Amino acid sequence: IVTNLKCTLAVTAGLCSSFAYAQKHPHVILIMTDQQRGDALGCMGNEAVISPNLDRLAGEGTLFMNGYSSCPSSTPARAGMLTGLSPWHHGMLGYGRGASQYRYEMPRMLGDLNYYSFGIGKMHWYPQKALHGFRGTLVDESGRVESPDFISDYRLWFQMQAPGLNPDSTHIGWNDHGAATYKLPERLHPTAWTGEMACEMIRNY
């Protein structure tokens, strides 16, 4: 784990216990990181970044050297992944609030094909607990609270794991211009939590 990199979205879908069913419905795991340059990977020749797991995925799969996002801002890029549409068609031309539901949403379409889809990590949707076709979510919204009754799943977990510690004490934010080593135990990092929750979801489905 690169400790100053936050995982924004881990989607697990098609987690089927039946081998025959799984043969027809392959498992799908989509991992999306937040605010990461395309060359910030060891497999891209960047010696400053240690990313063995992502490097292995790239080595065993397909590495797109000319792939690009239709919008470099996080929320419209996420809306593009969710809907398969360009910013001009899903309606988010820049950073801001997206729709609470879109006409076409990938998790809902997977559900129509009998997949069980679940979203884990930073969603940055509005409302914050919107499902967008997922059967359920576990969200990390950092300190962003847009309704008085909301607290992110990561924050609840952090309070149980590290009572008395403040997750904001690292002073590393999503939109900061600087980077730093995570000062708390690595197991408390949002990316570590996202990965562990995704693995637990797969194990227990």
Residue spans for each PLM region:
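Bacterial N-terminal signal peptides that target proteins for export
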Residues: I1-L9
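Formylglycine-dependent sulfatase
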Residues: K6, L15, F19-Y205
